[in-house]
Design a protein with these regions (language model features):
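Extended alpha-helical, oligomerization-prone segments that build pores/tubes and scaffolds
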Residues: 1-254
Length: 254
């Protein structure tokens, strides 16, 4: 049987990360920023609690320890709070992100693609222009499940984030949502966002947190990459000891 050495190592490291769950503390840059810093220090914990950030933090750390990179997505959800809108923070699957090869910082990539599987009927009801385009044209990596999950009634939605300079040369972040070759939304076609871009800060809404850094990549490698050979060696030694115990325990007849 396999030992739980690798699993226990990762579980203990995750427990250490949860014991050190961070809390926001905003310090003033100047004396006249004191009131603003105090206000932000009071507001940010509430925002994170409403976004269920502790669960997101836990999920990101599991992926960071196992896969080598934890990715947090920070978005604006206009449908939250009864249509008032609010910040949404989510743990993002690294396998569903695609960027320009060779960049060290994800913000240096001119384009960034985020893929997701969504129900085709629900998408068609929300975006009528998708009617008649139910055939999937993009495939995505999938985890292997014991219950044999089917994706026959789902379509791949591509969230395309890209940076382009405006007439003044300043990089603006834009966003295009596509599904089965149909444009569902484009910020450059939105009069409110065509000139200013999707977000005023002009950055991709994804934060990469690698465990062990790789050169020329925003992603890293994790403990499974480092410790799997040791786990295999432990299992082989355990198997050899079990065989010896079984052989030694057999009753001998003279």
């Amino acid at each position: 049987p396999s030992s739980g050495w690798l699993f226990n190592s990762i579980a203990n490291k995750h427990a250490d990360a949860m014991d050190n769950y961070p809390e926001p503390m905003v310090l003033p840059r100047a004396a006249d920023d004191q009131a603003t810093a105090q206000a932000l220090s009071s507001v940010l914990p509430v925002v994170l609690e409403q976004a269920d950030y502790e669960q997101v933090y836990s999920d990101v750390w599991w992926r960071k320890l196992k896969q080598g990179t934890g990715v947090t997505g920070i978005f604006w959800d206009p449908a939250a709070r009864g249509g008032l809108g609010d910040i949404a923070v989510r743990s993002v699957n690294l396998l569903m992100l695609y960027w320009e090869p060779g960049v060290q910082d994800i913000q240096d990539s001119p384009d960034l693609f985020h893929l997701s599987l969504e129900d085709t009927a629900r998408l068609t009801a929300q975006y009528p222009q998708l009617a008649g385009h139910a055939a999937g044209v993009v495939d995505v990596p999938r985890y292997i499940h014991e219950d044999g999950q089917t994706t026959a009634n789902k379509s791949v939605v591509v969230d395309w984030y890209y940076k382009r300079p405006d007439e003044n040369g300043k990089l603006r972040l834009h966003y295009c949502k596509l599904c089965n070759g149909v444009v569902l939304y484009a910020s450059q076609n939105d009069p409110a966002l065509a000139a200013r871009g999707l977000y005023d800060h002009g950055k991709y809404p994804f934060v990469f947190d690698p465990l062990f850094v790789e050169e020329d990549s925003p992603a890293g490698f994790g403990y499974i990459d480092v410790m799997k050979d040791c786990q295999n060696a432990i299992d082989k030694m355990n198997h050899a000891m079990d065989e010896n115990v079984l052989l030694a325990s057999r009753q001998r007849y003279v």
